[in-house]
Amino acid sequence: MHILQVITGATLVSVPFVSAIPSSTSEFLPSTAEQNSAVLHSQGRSPPRLWTRLRDSIIETIWRVPSRQHNPSRIPSSLSIPRAPSSIRARYGDDVVLRFTIRSQNDVQALIEASNILFLDIWASTNEWVDIRLAKDVVSSLLGLLPSSLRTAHVPIIHDLAQAVYESYPQPVSSVPNPHHAFSPSVQQSSETQNIFFQDYQPLSVIIPWMRLLASMFSTHVRLVNLGTSYEGREIVGFRIGVRPANADLPTERRKTIVITGGSHAREWIGVSTVNYVAYSLITGYGKSRAITKLVEEFDWVLIPTMNPDGYVYTWETDRLWRKNRQENNLQFCPGVDLDRTWGYEWDGSDSRSNPCSEDFAGDGPFGGRESKVIAQWALNETNHHNVTFVGFLDLHSYSQQILYPYSYSCTNIPPTLENLEELAIGIAKAIRLTDHEHYDVSSACEGSVSSHKKRRGAALRSMQSAGGSALDWFYHDLHVRYAYQLKLRDKGGYGFLLPKKNIVPTGKEVYNAVLVFGQFLLGRGAQDIDWEGDFQFPAHSRPNVPEKEYRGPDEEYEISNQLEDDDNENDTLLGFRTQKV
């Protein structure tokens, strides 16, 4: 067992748990299924090996982890999920989430106007539907503002938001819930169910020590970068993964760099976890996977798990559904700006975006958000003074399962590299689909999700959430990043921002495979002698029969024959598109 597995588990145990629900942590109880599963594991597991017993003994002694000996008879035979406590009920009341089916641009405009009047929280929108959060007693007011075509074109997707929020929080742990698996945070297929870090969402107080641990353990190709400080003084930390010439902080040639970000909107926890998953896969795959080794040698990868640390902490401590950052505004009772509306390119402060109480408040001017400003300054400084050329940008959000390319601010202005943007986006969508059969739509960020038959008819509708001032447009236009995308991750609305923890690893695998496709495309001809498909990660239930391989170093040559068929049973290979050397 790798020593990293031991230390990482111990780090997670030793970091105090950040209470997700103030004053009510004692009300968390594991589900019946989880407890029964724990009993079955304890009864059916073979005795641990000597090294395992020694390892656990050391950890238990140093970090005072309780012994794994327990009495299964003390576990209740039947437990139901408790009702949300009063603190949650007081905040979310009788709120629900409704999905409206849209059929025309008039429907979109009507929903925009009504939502602005009532200051409603638009959760997500596509070319076919819009999800809106509102109190039950506001439903009649909303319907009264809508045309007849929309008054019956809606269904509830979350009936009791307070209960859904309560059930989305991780349960506090005073000890390791399953000590046999506690110190094995590998992302390898065989250890998927034993990975303690990715078994649940993690607070910032756990993420930062975990990042420092990885940087110290893999110092040959990993270091932490501090991009600046947030409004409340927290460091905005990222991984820089890449192999540079020895003792050369300033490379002689411009270093091609790819940026992957998450957590711009605080409530989108799956984006934070997915950035961490991809980072871990790149870090631990170097020297073992020929594909990853090539990517780490040819590019620097800067991965920023949360661009909005203040907002992210606030979602753990106070309001799970907080979206904006936490800076003060002219209205003291409506703090925060939507960071993804504050970037400098085509900033738009009109309509609801000029109201500090709006969920998409764009601030008082370009770069009015503290965090977007410092990240932009960092990127410009890297370009102007550190010989860096940014060649790729992936901004992870949730939800609705979409791959969006520039522009967000306009559907009439066409990006000059549209053909290449669409080609790579389709390749990314295909990689995700082959991972776990999840379908991601591809479109311009100014539109909703556009199916192919609607696109042929010219029926694309402008998205309710498209706007100027996005990170996507700024990186593409102002920083001249040729391949910039926003990925809206799982799901399509069953849970929305409250995606259950069982989706963390599958979503991570989807985006990891997408990153492989992304890097392969940017490598151009240099990628042609590598079996990229052989390095794909698959969930256990959908993993194809491919031969196992072991890569012992950057110079080792090997050949593996493996062809994957797509969902339409076509005979083309997954990565059969044209590559583009950048």
Swiss-Prot record:
- SUPFAM superfamilies reported for this sequence: Zn-dependent exopeptidases
The record's free-text note on cofactor binding: Binds 1 zinc ion per subunit.
Disulphide bond pairs = 334-357
Which UniProt keywords are present, listed alphabetically?
Cell wall biogenesis/degradation, Disulfide bond, Glycoprotein, Metal-binding, Secreted, Signal, Vacuole, Zinc
* Cofactor requirement: Zn(2+)
Q: Which residues form a coiled coil?
A: none
Glycosylated residues: list them.
381, 387, 571
Which positions are listed as propeptide?
A: 21-172
**Which InterPro entries does the protein's record reference?**
Peptidase_M14
Q: Where is the Peptidase M14 domain?
A: 200-522
Q: Which family does it belong to?
A: Belongs to the peptidase M14 family.
Known role: Inactive carboxypeptidase that may play a role in cell wall organization and biogenesis.
Q: Under which name does UniProt file this protein? A: Inactive metallocarboxypeptidase ECM14
Q: Which gene encodes it?
A: ECM14
